[in-house]
Design a protein with these regions (language model features):
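Membrane-interface interhelical linkers
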Residues: 2-46, 50-64, 111-128, 159-209, ...
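Hydrophobic transmembrane alpha-helices of multi-pass small-molecule transport proteins
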Residues: 17-18, 23, 80-84, 94-113, ...
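Hydrophobic/small/kink-forming positions within alpha-helical transmembrane segments
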Residues: 24, 45-53, 73-81, 135, ...
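Helix-coil boundary and interhelical linker segments in multi-pass alpha-helical membrane proteins
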Residues: 26-39, 79-95, 143-152, 205-211, ...
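Specific alpha-helical transmembrane segments that line the substrate/conduction pathway
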Residues: 43-48, 60-107, 153-156, 160-161, ...
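C-terminal structured domain segments across diverse proteins
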Residues: 209-210, 216, 225, 229, ...
């Protein structure tokens, strides 16, 4: 949705603003965060904002089939590593094998076509930075959801704070007249906002029941659908090696589930 839009910053801000509006009424029915959780919410708001900034930059230089597998497929390795270091979560041999597949898939995507054009190199760099932000906020949010009274309370506050921060940034960068009409908001942002809120609420709930790396890995199986969308709908030329790499990343994250 963001990749196919004209102004990607405004499109992402539309979706984020609507996510905040969805979360806003919910905060009146959930407990206030503790001081510890407030700190995590402040940190993750910065991380979510950084993620969106670099995602927009990545899509400015590369296609969905190149950027999305790198950004999303790279995160489970980092999340699993953080889970081991911070929480003592261990991985099965199958999970380790999955990580190897993910790594090989990422390398294949990052260095295809003899290194790629200058734009592709920039897209690769920004996508890998995006993966770092995804892994960071996923880890922080997983810990925050466990510390909060309920994971859904954490999600409600997260979307309100994240939406306020990124919308303010987008207004500062683009101004109040840049496609902020109600019709534009609803058309560009509502479907993505609803999916984002529901999906991430389920992800954080799952992270209170299972290791962070495993949940993150299952979430990132969407790289296969992104590869298909980029080829069939956006008409991006992936090439056989890129398609195989995307499938390798998907197979890897399934193995990580163990």
């Amino acid at each position: 949705m963001v990749r196919a839009s004209g102004d990607k910053l405004v499109s992402l801000a539309n979706m984020t603003a609507l996510s905040a509006l969805i979360g806003l009424p919910l905060i009146f029915f959930v407990p206030l965060p503790s001081r510890e959780v407030w700190g995590l919410l402040a940190l993750t708001t910065l991380l979510h904002t950084g993620y969106k900034i670099f995602l927009v930059r990545a899509y400015a230089h590369g296609g969905l089939g190149h950027v999305y597998p790198l950004a999303r497929g790279g995160a489970p390795l980092l999340v699993a590593g953080a889970g081991f270091v911070l929480l003592g979560e261990t991985l099965s041999p199958a999970s380790l094998a999955g990580m190897l597949l993910v790594t090989l898939g990422i390398i294949s995507l990052a260095f295809r076509k003899n290194g790629g054009t200058q734009d592709e190199k920039r897209a690769t760099l920004y996508a890998l930075i995006t993966a770092g932000f995804i892994a960071s906020y996923t880890t922080v949010d997983g810990i925050g959801a466990r510390l909060a009274e309920t994971s859904f309370a954490y999600v409600a506050w997260l979307f309100v704070l994240d939406g306020a921060a990124f919308t303010a940034l987008a207004l500062w960068r683009r101004g109040p007249g840049a496609a902020w009409s109600p019709a534009t908001l609803l058309r560009q942002g509502l479907p993505g906002a609803l999916l984002q809120v529901v999906a991430y609420a389920l992800v954080l709930w799952a992270m209170t029941k299972a290791p962070l790396g495993l949940v993150s890995a299952v979430r990132e199986t969407s790289v296969v659908f992104a590869a298909l969308i980029s080829s069939l709908i956006l008409k991006e030329k992936l090439g056989p090696m890129a398609a195989i790499a995307a499938l390798a990343v998907a197979a890897g994250v399934i193995l990580i589930e163990g």
